[in-house]
Amino acid sequence: DGGEVYMGGSTSLMSTMEYTFNEDVILGLLSGFVEEKEGFLGLEGNGAFTLDNSSNLSKFNSLKIQKNVRDDLALTLTGTLAYSDFEGDSASLLKSADNVLSESYSLTLNKANLFGNDNFAISISQPNRVRDGSLTLRLSDLADIDGNINIRDTGVDLEPSGRQIDTSFAYTKDISENFTFSLKATITDEFNHIKDNDKHYSGYIGLNFENLKVGVSDGTNISRPSLSLK
């Protein structure tokens, strides 16, 4: 299976395959391309480091393995590897990056009918993180005696100092046919893959009634609680 998806400033082309070995083991594969306009692996830039008129093409492969331990208990492992090529605008100090390798992982345990008509999940995951690669910057030397300024290319290592790990707990309860209660809590270590960043805590409480969704989220890394209504 496959298809092309447009998401704001990005376009993706994906192909999926799922194979059931038996009733207990399911293997899924996902491959594709993602083209970002004015973006690069979550990088934010402005001024001299603007991402305006830039482009980034990422090629990725994902693997999912699901093991049904019992009828109501499943263990799921996912992993993604991607290679990215970035081309910056000629007016930006961000010039280019080639074959930047990034990866993400997750391990999730789902238990259905813990107390009846509900689902409990615990997961440990690493968001997308650069494992290898460098970014080429356009840097200028001091002007010579004639006032000429030399522009030179300088490589900067993109591998971060830390590794973000998210430990999440999620609970969903069907109170009635049209009424669902949901709760989620997450502990984040080394936020944004920065080694010295403090541990963060976040949570979400939500109610779904027919087509109405109401939720409140809060965390130590945001200034105030957020209310969502859909």
For each feature predicted by the language model, list its residue ranges.
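Long, charge-dense tracts
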Residues: 1-2
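Outer-membrane beta-barrel translocator/receptor signature
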Residues: 222-225
